[in-house]
Amino acid sequence: MSDAASPAGSPAAEPTEHRDEDQVNETHQDDGSNHGGNDEDNDGGNDKDSDVLSEIDENEFGDDYGSRPVDIDENVAMKLKARRKTTTETTKKPKEGRRPKKRSRGDDDVDAADDDGERRPRKVRAEGERRARKEVEEQQAQQEENLTPDERRRRALERAIDAAVKNPTKRRRKKDDIDLEEETDEQIANLKVAMEKACVADNEAREQKQPAVHKLKLLPQVTAILNRTAIQDSVLDPEINFLQSVRYFLEPLNDGSLPAYNIQRAIMSALMKLPINKDVLLSSGIGKVVVYYNKSKSPSADIKRDAERLLGEWSRLILKRTDDYKKRHIEMREIDVGAVKLGQREGGSSQVTLTQRPAGKSRYEIERERALAPEVRNNNRARPVGLPASYTIAPKSTYIPGQAPTDHRPIGHSGHEAFRRMTQKGKGKR
């Protein structure tokens, strides 16, 4: 079929030049996409393609092929690989340049101008001062080397006296030009006055048969002061003597009744956390109240336990005893081996005198005391042995390394010898 015989409107009927122009415009609109194929396929103006298209019957494509299911082989589908995106399909993100590094504060900070008029960083200035100080110290050391021993000793003594006499500068905490320590002392002084007034008011209320609630109202402020670790020095200062007012809170009222349980519980718990020393105990007198709570039957069991624990800790401060087992001092005495053997031979009566025998006595003195002792009647009775429950004196070790003992037989070896002789006699009779 020729081009002239093709139906109107078919691709073959259009002029070749117009078709080429339309295809060029479509390629420009697609922005360089690859859907069009190569140049030979896009041409489409040759006679062979037009002849093939003109011979196809359009009625054969009347059925809808899109709705029919398509069979896909799974083995083939699994072998397919995902296509990677080409560089032309994705737009590249513009590359950013390097960001400037942040400079440290020490490099930026500079002090005032130096003698030469230049502004230098603070680190450089500190290094210069350190170097100058080191040079001065080296010069002083060289000067001391040239001095006599007496002059060196005199200078060392002067430096030691200056260091001992010089008082350390005590920095006082300030906030907004307000001295916090003075404010704390004033607050404690005002609270002391309020606590004493509350104690007097509770005693007057009990005399009038009314409930004593003034201490309970003031209790939160008292516990807040006692539990603040930052002002413990002010609380324990003997000059301020805040614990004396705390003692008034714990003391019984005039009618003999104890304060409320909440007061006892809160103050006892706070006292166990405070590092109280001997001077504070003497100035405040709070130990007397703790002793009363320990011996009285009125407080509850937990309050008595706390009072007993406080009494034990404070007694160590007064008696200068430590609760460290390593620092414990144990009295030691030398043991008299001859007296121990003599007591074992004489039987059970020596057990009573073993604990009563003082150190340093000879065997003759021990036997003389036993002979002069009054007679014990009713010997046929069985009496418990009077041994102490615990020992307070430890024997002193007489072992000398590298030296052979004079008496190698241990204590109680004579009984083994008697038993051995008895067994030998029995064998001889057989």
Swiss-Prot record:
Residues 244-321 form the TFIIS N-terminal domain. The keyword Transcription regulation applies. Transcription factor involved in RNA polymerase II transcription regulation. May function in both SPT15/TBP post-recruitment and recruitment steps of transcription. It comes from the Eukaryota. This is Transcription factor iws-1. One of its GO terms (biological process) is poly(A)+ mRNA export from nucleus. Keywords: Nucleus, Transcription, Transcription regulation. The gene is iws-1. Belongs to the IWS1 family. GO terms for cellular component: nucleus. The keyword Transport does not apply. Residues 1-14 have a biased composition (Low complexity). Its main location: nucleus. Transmembrane segments: none annotated. Residues 95-104 have a biased composition (Basic residues). Residues 1-153, 402-430 are annotated as: Disordered. Coiled coil: none annotated. Pfam families: Med26. It is found in: Nucleus. InterPro entries: RNAPII_TF_IWS1, TFIIS/LEDGF_dom_sf, TFIIS_N. PANTHER family: PROTEIN IWS1 HOMOLOG. Residues 52-63 have a biased composition (Acidic residues). Residues 15-33, 124-137, 406-420 have a biased composition (Basic and acidic residues).
